[in-house]
Regions:
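A short, conserved alpha-helix within the catalytic core of class I
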Residues: 120-132
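Conserved N-terminal segment of class I S-adenosyl-L-methionine
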Residues: 1-106, 114, 124-127, 153-155, ...
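Active-site loop signature of alpha/beta-hydrolase-fold enzymes
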Residues: 80, 103, 119, 144-147
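Flexible, active-site-proximal loop/turn residues at the rims of small-molecule/cofactor binding pockets
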Residues: 117, 126, 143
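Short catalytic micro-motifs in class I SAM-dependent methyltransferases
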Residues: 112-119
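Conserved class I S-adenosyl-L-methionine
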Residues: 138-160
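Short glycine-dipeptide loop
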Residues: 133-137
Length: 234
């Protein structure tokens, strides 16, 4: 089996490791952080598959700014990405290079699963392991079964999701409904929030997104997607 996370192919295809999206994703999950119960003014956090480590750093900074002592661990299959995370976030206390089910520690107050579950083949088994690792789990799950992605799937002669797998390393593709169903099967959902990426792409100052906004068809997709979200029941 090809290990795209250690043969550098994933980083070659995604050289920024999505740092341009970090602030947007953090703002989406920030609303959940105040719900995490902190005992004795201390919190132990595990960031799984944290990419460049920027979202983990923002979470860590959030608790530090609130006067909380943080123990922060990063777990990843990729040794190179762990080095990048440590460089971007020197306050990481421990890096763990193994799969989730091999994690040598437990009793985490918070586990971060930000854009990770779609990469893991055994997602059901992984969810059970996560329940053993931590008291609170924050997921961010990309919604890739939607109106426009289905159109792209049909237009590509049913090859679109195969290409997405090669490009992004995604094994599973979720709709909003299937993501909620997955979470309910394995966890007690305390809160959830959905903000489509169209708003991020539409207003981000990131150079590639600025260029994309000059594309006529891309603009149509963004505007219609945002309109649907704003005008249909959620």
């Amino acid at each position: 089996m090809i290990d795209i996370y250690n043969d550098d192919s994933y980083i070659e295809k995604n050289p920024t490791l999505h740092t341009e999206d970090s602030e947007f994703k953090f703002q989406n999950i920030k609303r959940f952080l105040s719900s995490v119960q902190v005992k004795n003014n201390r919190i132990k956090i595990l960031d799984i598959g944290g990419g460049a480590g920027m979202i983990g750093k923002l979470v860590l900074d959030y608790f530090l700014e609130n006067g909380i002592v943080v123990t922060f661990h990063s777990l990843d299959l990729s040794t190179r990405m762990l080095k990048i995370q440590l460089k971007n976030n020197p306050l990481i206390n421990k890096i763990i290079n193994c799969s989730i089910d091999e994690c040598p520690e437990s009793n985490y107050d918070l586990v971060l699963m930000i854009d990770v579950i779609e990469h893991i083949e055994g997602k059901e088994y992984t969810a059970k392991i996560l329940n053993k690792l931590g008291k609170n789990i924050i997921y961010n799950i990309p919604i890739e079964i939607n109106f426009f992605d289905i159109l792209k799937y049909l237009k590509s002669n049913f090859r679109y999701y195969k290409r997405q797998k090669v490009r992004w390393g995604h094994i599973h593709f979720f709709s909003f409904t299937s993501s909620q169903s997955f979470l309910r099967r394995h966890h007690k959902i305390i809160d959830s929030y959905f903000q489509p990426y169209c708003f991020h792409y539409k207003y981000s100052d990131y150079e590639s997104y600025l260029k994309l906004r000059h594309d006529f068809f891309w603009n149509i997709e963004l505007n219609i997607s945002c309109w649907i979200f704003n005008n249909f029941p959620k």
